[in-house]
Amino acid sequence: LLSIYTLKAQDTRLNNVVNTLKERITLAGYAQVGYTYDDAGEKASNTFDLKRAIFMARGKITDKWSCYFMYSFANTGKILEAYTEYRFLPQLTARIGQFKTMYTIENPMSPCFVELINCYSQAVNYLAGINGSDPLYGSNSGRDMGILIYGDLFKKKLSYNFAVMNGQGINLKDKNN
């Protein structure tokens, strides 16, 4: 009888742990494939390719403190985002780590929301360093390392973002101190 009670108590504790993890950890992902046909030049070409294969994990440490991780399996594979953020007030949140820069309106949008494989305008590609069109900035997928202070004011009628970024792009430490 004692061993049955012990097993039930252990089972209850395990269920509590599993339920807590389910409430606090979110896993997600998506993939986008494409087909390209090009008849310019001497030879026509066509190909299928894997544009994006993304894995995401979000952890809720407390009601105010969270963390986020995003990894891309497409091409060479790399960490796209890894950051933690703390919400001091509904109007004031601080984020530190590697994340999308808030330089344009389009850059923070997910490709799933835009619903196009090549989803950014040429200006955003250049300014945010998404596709490597700026030779000085390189191709950083519109991401960088740094700290971001952001929030919404006046019942979400005014949003602000203030960031101090590394300037080197993703997965690189600062080269000029």
Question: Language-model segments: what does each one mean?
Answer:
Residues Q168, K173-N177:
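Short, intrinsically disordered, charge-balanced linker/junction segments flanking boundaries
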Residues L1-T12:
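Bacterial Sec-dependent N-terminal signal peptides
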